[in-house]
């Protein structure tokens, strides 16, 4: 969990996208914008968390903190998380 800080720092600097596996088109969504993308397995709990996270984004409230909380909760659910980076 040392890399949580690293993820946090990067999420402050860039928008981090939360995607469900089947929504991903890597070429379009990663390379063009050079964003960090967290790809999650498609479970009901993950969907619920994703909706809550996106609600926070819309409200504009403490986004980076919400991202860290979101990822923590996904880990608690033992959700598979893959982090994919766009080309630098």
Regions found by a protein language model. Name each.
Residues 14-16, 37, 69:
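Intrinsic disorder/low-structure terminal segments
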Residues 1-29:
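Short, charged/polar N-terminal "headpieces" of proteins
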Residues 49-88:
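C-terminal basic regulatory modules in eukaryotic proteins
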Residues 30-52, 58:
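Acidic, low-complexity, intrinsically disordered interaction modules
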């Amino acid at each position: 969990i040392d890399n949580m800080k690293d993820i946090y720092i990067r999420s402050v600097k860039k928008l981090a996208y939360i995607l469900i596996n089947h929504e991903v088109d890597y070429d379009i969504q990663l390379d063009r914008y050079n964003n960090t993308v967290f790809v999650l397995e498609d479970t009901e709990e993950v969907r619920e968390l994703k909706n809550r996270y996106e609600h926070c984004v819309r409200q504009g409230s403490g986004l980076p903190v919400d991202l860290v909380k979101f990822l923590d909760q996904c880990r608690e659910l033992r959700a598979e998380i893959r982090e994919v980076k766009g080309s630098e």
